[in-house]
Structure formats: C-alpha cells, structure tokens
Amino acid sequence: MPRIAIVGGSGVYDFPAENKREETVKTPYGEVKITVGVVGDEEVAFLARHGKGHSIPPHKINYRANIWALYELGVERIIATSAVGSMNPEMKPGDFVILDQIIDFTVSRPRTFYDGEESPHERKFVAHVDFTEPYCPEIRKALITAARNLGLPYHPRGTYVCTEGPRFETAAEIRAYRILGGDVVGMTQCPEAILARELEMCYATVAIVTNYAAGMSGKKLTHSEVVELMQKKSEDIVKLILAAIPLIPKERRCGCKDALKGATG
C-alpha cells in the first residue's frame, strides 16, 4: 500500500520506479488510473494530473476523483509538481520554489467533497477545514532540505496565485497579483491542495519556474516554452523528489491529519 504519492504536473508524465503496476481506482467521482511502483524502500503512487501527454486542460481536471483515488489507495502524503510563471524578479526560470501560500482566483471548479446530502458518498455533511497553512510543513521541510543538499537553485517559500486558465494571464492581472503578494502563477493548485486537506492528507508542492509571467519580459507566452524548460529540468525534478522521500517522517505529527476536527457540526 503506497504511503506517498507524486502528482506530476505539466511536463512530468512519468516517474522512475521499480516493479511498476497500473491500478484503476473507482471513486464516487469516476475512475482514475494510477501507477504504483517501488522507490527505495517505499511503495509510491504516481498520477499524471493532466493525463498522459497533457490531454486534460487545468479547468477540466477531475481533481476530486484524483485525490479520492489516492486516498482509497492508502496514500497519506502527496508531493506535487507545478510549472509556474514568475512574478517575482528574484525567482528566475529554472528555479525551484517550495510553495507555502496560495491565493485562489479559480471560479468554476468543484472544490469540496462535502456537499451535504448531495455528496455521492457516505460523508453527507458540510465541512469548513482550516487552510491557514495550505501546505504540509513536514513535506515542505523534506523538500527544502533535499534541494539544499543537492545544491539546486531554490526558494524556501513562495505564494502561488491560482488562475482559472487555460489562457495565460493579462499583464494587468499580473500587476494586480503582485500587489496582493503573489510570487508565482499557475492553474492547478486549487482545488487540489484544498481537497487533500479535506481528506486529512499531507500535501506539498515543488513549483518549477518556467518563464516570467505576462508583461514581465515583453515576450509572448507559449506552452511550448513551459514544456521545453520542464524537459530540461526533469532530471533535477526527479533527483529532488527522490532525495526528499526518505526525509519525510513515517509518523505524521503535522496538523494535516486532524483537519476535520472542529470542521463539522
């Protein structure tokens, strides 16, 4: 039973592991295909967020099915990757950012498992989970330590602005997000991080800066540019995650595991 899962974003459609097998997990929100393999002494699950070959746009991803499927497999910890545009001049293309905060500007995505009586499962209640610190401190610490030990260009914190997509942002939007305190911008952290918290799973993300955001460089933004840089950084992404996995404590002492306490009723 995998304790740890990797959710691969743009440019991360597979992960090296031994004895791989494909699992099809049925959830109340649909079926999900997950790869399970062995990394070191850990059984690890891998899920390609956008599907193989980037076939699903960010606003159409079945986030609820994905997170529920990992939960059903017994996953407690999730390491996600996310390609991002930088709004912070200090965060350059090729840098890694271990995210610590989110500003959510998505508008059309289902963002909770707890829809009361309308929930398609036995948890027919309403929950208001605490999201003060959206990312697991224990996984973040492991990622930061691994990045430092490997000598990778990294930033130990960063605020992610999540937009609806699939279009890139306007220059005016980026100026507004910078005023609000955003460092990087992307399209997938919400509701993914929220849903993981609702199921009391630990979740953290390593963001990879692929370009400067709209209006920052004067260049046209292209998805091919994102994929190209992610391919160049793929080896470092794998090294970072492989180095972080053994640093994640077996026993969870973070607040993620108790997210539903006080959230209902």
Swiss-Prot record:
Catalytic reaction annotation: a purine D-ribonucleoside + phosphate = a purine nucleobase + alpha-D-ribose 1-phosphate; guanosine + phosphate = alpha-D-ribose 1-phosphate + guanine; inosine + phosphate = alpha-D-ribose 1-phosphate + hypoxanthine
Effect recorded for residue 256 to S: Fully active, but reduces thermodynamic and kinetic stability of the enzyme
GO CC aspect terms: cytosol
A matching Pfam family: PNP_UDP_1
Keywords, sorted A to Z: Disulfide bond, Glycosyltransferase, Purine salvage, Transferase
Record-linked Gene3D superfamilies: Nucleoside phosphorylase domain (3.40.50.1580)
Pathway assigned to this chain's UniProt record: Purine metabolism; purine nucleoside salvage
Site feature Important for substrate specificity, where: 169, 223
Effect on the protein upon substituting residue 211 to D: Decreases catalytic activity for insosine and allows the enzyme to phosphorolytically cleave MTA with a catalytic efficiency about 4-fold higher than for inosine
Enzyme nomenclature, EC number: 2.4.2.1
Residue positions binding substrate: 187, 211-213
CDD domains: MTAP_SsMTAPII_like_MTIP
Source taxon at top rank: Archaea
GO annotation terms (biological process): L-methionine salvage from methylthioadenosine; purine ribonucleoside salvage
Role played: Purine nucleoside phosphorylase which is highly specific for 6-oxopurine nucleosides. Cleaves guanosine or inosine to respective bases and sugar-1-phosphate molecules. Involved in purine salvage.
Subunit structure: Homohexamer. Dimer of a homotrimer.
Further information: Although this enzyme belongs to the family of MTA phosphorylases based on sequence homology, it has been shown that conserved amino acid substitutions in the substrate binding pocket convert the substrate specificity of this enzyme from 6-aminopurines to 6-oxopurines. It seems that P.furiosus has developed a specific enzyme (PF0853) for the metabolism of 6-oxo-purines, next to the canonical MTA phosphorylase PF0016.
Protein family per UniProt: Belongs to the PNP/MTAP phosphorylase family. MTAP subfamily.
Name the UniProt record assigns to this protein: 6-oxopurine nucleoside phosphorylase
Organism from which the protein derives: Pyrococcus furiosus (strain ATCC 43587 / DSM 3638 / JCM 8422 / Vc1)
